[in-house]
Structures are given as structure tokens and as C-alpha cells.
């Protein structure tokens, strides 16, 4: 029984590594936004909605990893 519990904790910890990728993705999206707007301020209205879409897609992958982690801890 202890081995199954240890495997759940290890699996949940490993599945949260995907949150690191989501954080890096969000940082890249907003770094590109800041870089683009600083070079051409008039394009802000065009680029900002795309940056929010990129943020949402990056965050969705992180939330999927978090959901898998919670399922491993509490669901199975």
C-alpha cells in the first residue's frame, strides 16, 4: 500500500513539470509583445489580442498538467 502511495506522489510531482513549460511559454509570449510594441507602438491594437490568445493557449497546457496531477493524487 505504501508503494502505491509513493508512486502517486512521484507521478503527481513529475506531472507538474509541464507547469514549467507553461510558465516559460507565457514569458516568451509577453516578451515578444513588449519587444514588438516597443519597436512599433502603433501596432499595439493588432498584437495585443494575439498575445492574449497565446497566453491562454500556454496556460491551458499548464492547467491540463495540473489536472492530471490532481487526478493522480485524488482520483485514482
From Swiss-Prot:
Keywords: CF(0), Formylation, Hydrogen ion transport, Ion transport, Lipid-binding, Membrane, Mitochondrion, Transmembrane, Transmembrane helix, Transport. It holds the Pfam family ATP-synt_C. The keyword Nucleotidyltransferase does not apply. It is a multi-pass membrane protein. The modification N-formylmethionine is found at residue 1. SUPFAM superfamilies: F1F0 ATP synthase subunit C (SSF81333). The chain crosses the membrane at residues 14-34, 52-72. It is found in: Mitochondrion membrane. Changing residue 57 to V: In oligomycin-resistant mutant and cross-resistance to venturicidin. GO terms for biological process: proton motive force-driven ATP synthesis. The record marks 59 as: Reversibly protonated during proton transport. One of its GO terms (cellular component) is mitochondrial inner membrane. Changing residue 46 to L: In strain: DS400/A3 and KL14-4A. GO terms for molecular function: identical protein binding; lipid binding; proton transmembrane transporter activity. Belongs to the ATPase C chain family. F-type ATPases have 2 components, CF(1) - the catalytic core - and CF(0) - the membrane proton channel. In yeast, the dimeric form of ATP synthase consists of 17 polypeptides: alpha, beta, gamma, delta, epsilon, 4 (B), 5 (OSCP), 6 (A), 8, 9 (C), d, E (Tim11), f, g, h, i/j and k. Mitochondrial membrane ATP synthase (F(1)F(0) ATP synthase or Complex V) produces ATP from ADP in the presence of a proton gradient across the membrane which is generated by electron transport complexes of the respiratory chain. F-type ATPases consist of two structural domains, F(1) - containing the extramembraneous catalytic core and F(0) - containing the membrane proton channel, linked together by a central stalk and a peripheral stalk. During catalysis, ATP synthesis in the catalytic domain of F(1) is coupled via a rotary mechanism of the central stalk subunits to proton translocation. This is ATP synthase subunit 9, mitochondrial. It comes from Saccharomyces cerevisiae (strain ATCC 204508 / S288c). The lineage of its organism: Eukaryota, Fungi, Dikarya, Ascomycota, Saccharomycotina. The gene is OLI1.
Amino acid at each position: 500500500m505504501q508503494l502505491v502511495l509513493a508512486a502517486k506522489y512521484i507521478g503527481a510531482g513529475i506531472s507538474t513539470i509541464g507547469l514549467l513549460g507553461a510558465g516559460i511559454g507565457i514569458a516568451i509570449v509577453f516578451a515578444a509583445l513588449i519587444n514588438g510594441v516597443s519597436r512599433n507602438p502603433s501596432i499595439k491594437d493588432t498584437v495585443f489580442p494575439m498575445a492574449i490568445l497565446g497566453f491562454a493557449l500556454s496556460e491551458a497546457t499548464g492547467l491540463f498538467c495540473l489536472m492530471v496531477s490532481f487526478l493522480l493524487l485524488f482520483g485514482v
